[in-house]
Amino acid sequence: MPSSVELQNVSLLSILRNVSLQVAPGESVALIGRSGAGKTTMLRMMNGIVVPTSGNVLVDGVSLATADLIALRRRTGMIIQGSGLFPHRTVYENVATVPRLLGWDDAKTREAARTLMSKMAMSFDDFKDRMPRSLSGGEQQRVGIARAMIANPPLMLCDEPFAALDPIVRRELQETFIKLRSDATIVFVTHDLPEALRVAERIVLVDRGEIALDCAARDFVASSHPLARQFVDSATVAA
């Protein structure tokens, strides 16, 4: 069952000001904006890493001020820029992190890892014992995606996960992510409009700690909002 997420008039110092946002179960939402706009802060509030100075954050209707944050994080998949792999653990040990916390036995974990990695064009037998330092950037990020998705989390939080990769690998991983997302609720931070249009059905434009625009992805490119036009024009030039 996919999760719902809600920010209710949250503020944090000068970073966010009275931000409200609702994400419905199964919805995919991209937070887009310039660097320093407050996108990542909003994302980190959704699993309790950052606590607002005022306002409330709810996941599945439960305030994070009183929620069991450890349990919440175990059922939340998170993908960050640079993969965030444990450098001294093998590929399999990294992928098995959440299943072990959830009490899965090794046979179930191995089968799930084998199935998921095969969908990502990674042979389980070839990669399971390798260390992160022996992998390319794209391979590391594939392992990071597998670790986040192996337990089919109801909520996926993604913080510019493909930003450091070359364009070809980036597009491949975007397509892999879309294919594997299942029915999870997704909040995806990016400053790349083409990426936002690929992975999300709704785009929220964040500017200087406030929500400047919230619309369906298909409507964003036609918006007359000045900052939205800058993103559209930049994407057109890059293309």
Residues covered by each model-derived region:
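Catalytic Walker B motif of ABC-type/P-loop ATPase nucleotide-binding domains
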Residues: M156-D159
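Conserved ABC ATPase "signature" C-loop
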Residues: R208-G209
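A short, surface-exposed alpha-helical micro-motif characterized by mixed small hydrophobic
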Residues: A196-R198
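ABC ATPase NBD coupling module
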Residues: S63-G77, L101, S182, F220-S223
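Helical segment within the ABC ATPase nucleotide-binding domain
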Residues: R170-S182
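Conserved ABC ATPase signature
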Residues: M131-L135, E139
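Helix-to-loop junction immediately C-terminal to a conserved catalytic motif
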Residues: N47
